[in-house]
């Protein structure tokens, strides 16, 4: 008889669960809702894929990213799991075929964008079949306090309420403050959930901030990259134009770099991603479109060429460094111009015709401004950066870590004082 360990070994090829995974699997199999906040690279997908293969009915995985769905479904199918996805990358004929097969019981796991839950055809299928579990990936998208608020996530609860039998619900995210966790519990109507909040601390990561005028950033960036020699790294930029310019700058110095952003055609994006994953290029220069679901353990540095919009985004992106547990460096370059750029995007979001009421959009903008304020504080604080980050996410931390630019600077100043 199959059990979590036999599925883990047979389907996924692992001998044992990582810390925290097995308890989540057990709770979901026992019918208890779960809210899991686990850092990038902690193996969240195993936590719901294993029970999905042991529960009697079908599991629906709600995911916001087309590329992530494709990658995860591709890996499952390769492992012999009957899985499929439903999103806008499919033609109408492909969607109809997928739904017909779903009604015929072809699939064990179905990934879908939250908007797909509202399709009449999808709702008919869900009401005809036994839906044992609904998994919500990137669950922070349900909260206006989260960094990627998606109004369509708010309708997941309504979808669950239309099902003949309430499924167990698993909500997963890499970063969630107390505000966001409250929203996830409330908006998904989680019933007495088992909660896992893994420590956000990544002791192997060095955190650094550097103030630099826009005209100085290319020089500062080259200094940082050249110190890394042949190490693999990711450079995040806030605009596609900046990605292209930075990629050309690095290539002009003989550095093997590739670009990744939404304006590149899918084939180029896939090729550049594979070149980076298989070490054919040293550096990926990207917008925040790059990284979700990418597991490259040997990334030795992540540089943010521009300040991100909030600490949730920053920590998730910086956390793609050092997944092998070896030392890695995370450096943020910032200037006043970065803040103006982020405010421009916040205003643009306010003006967008996305069907949201004006008061909801105004509240979302207010919360985005609040998150930007903390991001700016992080960029300019003289405090220990690790302590600042951990406190923001609700953890207590030692006042000094000794492994960030501010701690190193104060140590250096103390040494100089002693020598005088």
Give residue spans per PLM region.
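C-terminal accessory/connector segments of nucleic-acid motor ATPases
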Residues: 352-420
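Helicase motor core with emphasis on the C-terminal RecA-like subdomain
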Residues: 2-11, 15-19, 23-45, 52-55, ...
